[in-house]
A protein has these predicted regions:
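Signature of N-terminal electron-transfer/Fe-S-associated modules in redox systems
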Residues: 1-139
Length: 139
């Protein structure tokens, strides 16, 4: 199947109903995308599919055909990554890639309300969210 993966053309052979999460990690070696719950409840596996945040554990590989898929590796050195470090928006790190990708999808300078709504599907057991919100607002 052909797609654009992290800004580059890619062709990956995998069963169409395999989870996008598993294809990214196992076939493509992109292990920055984390599996938390495997049920679409935690947001740890969030990636961008045609610039929209999706839980990769819920998306069949076939849905990525011809699409643009962006993982945390595709952001390179995005300012949000530094902001998360500067504002201690990450502790254990399991939720961080998904949080950053969900935040990227919010666009530039989102309001606190937009951040809270945009990250509602991304759970964090460590930070209490305020540091994450500050990190996103700082960029």
């Amino acid at each position: 199947m052909k797609l654009t993966l992290n800004g580059a053309p890619a062709e990956v052979d995998a069963p169409p109903m395999k989870r996008l999460l598993d294809v990214l990690r196992e076939e493509c070696g992109l292990t920055g995308t984390k599996e938390g719950c495997g049920e679409g409840e935690c947001g740890a596996c969030t990636v961008l599919l045609d610039d929209e945040p999706v839980c990769a554990c819920l998306v069949p590989w076939a849905h990525a055909e011809g699409a643009r898929v962006t993982t945390i590796e595709g952001l390179r050195e995005h300012p949000l990554q530094q902001a998360f470090m500067d504002h201690v928006g990450a502790q254990c790190g399991i939720c961080t890639p998904g949080m950053i990708l969900a935040a990227v999808a919010l666009g530039e300078r989102p309001s606190l309300e937009k951040i809270r709504i945009g990250l509602a599907g991304n759970l964090c057991r460590c930070t209490g969210y305020e540091a994450i919100y500050r990190a996103i607002q700082s960029v």
